[in-house]
């Protein structure tokens, strides 16, 4: 499902949701659901209820499709986590994205093969001891939110 918000002939927001099908499950929970891949409102139009209106319309459509939940993953940047909680979502999971630079790699990654020279690394950390990565500049908490319909 793709919905757009238009104001004065200009697209100012959008939401994109993929539904579970018989052939493919897109949400992590057992219930039949939809994954919100994108929800965006143009910065000049934020704070006017456009995102909430898009979400509520998407919920109406999801219910018509007999979905039981909506799932979304977001990073801790900005206020998106608070926004989802205020809009009836609950956090069910989290992990971290780690981006290691050459310098980070030199201090933390020791390949067994001396001919292997990693230059850059992306990793997902699902453990609980994130403090061990305090020296890594680029790390982001990724959070999963679920809304029951």
Q: What are these model-derived regions, one by one?
A:
Residues 4, 10-26, 35-40:
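Conserved beta-strand in the GNAT
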Residues 29-31:
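Short, flexible, mixed-charge acidic loops at enzyme active sites
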Residues 73, 90-139:
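Conserved catalytic-core motifs of GNAT/GCN5-like acyltransferases
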Residues 146-149:
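Short beta-strand-to-coil "C-cap" segments at the C-terminal boundary of structured domains/repeats
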């Amino acid at each position: 499902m793709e919905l757009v918000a238009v104001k004065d002939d200009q697209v100012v927001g959008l939401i994109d949701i993929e539904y579970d099908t018989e052939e493919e499950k897109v949400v992590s929970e057992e219930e039949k659901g939809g994954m919100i891949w994108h929800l965006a409102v143009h910065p000049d139009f934020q704070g006017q209820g456009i995102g909430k209106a898009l979400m509520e319309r998407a919920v109406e459509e999801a219910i018509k499709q007999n979905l039981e939940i909506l799932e979304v993953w977001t990073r801790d940047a900005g206020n998106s986590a608070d926004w989802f909680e205020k809009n009836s979502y609950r956090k069910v999971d989290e992990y971290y994205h780690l981006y290691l630079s050459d310098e980070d790699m030199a201090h933390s990654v020791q390949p067994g093969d001396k001919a292997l020279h990693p230059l850059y690394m992306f990793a997902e950390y699902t453990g609980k001891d994130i403090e061990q990565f305090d020296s890594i500049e680029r790390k982001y908490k990724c959070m999963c939110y679920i809304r029951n319909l």
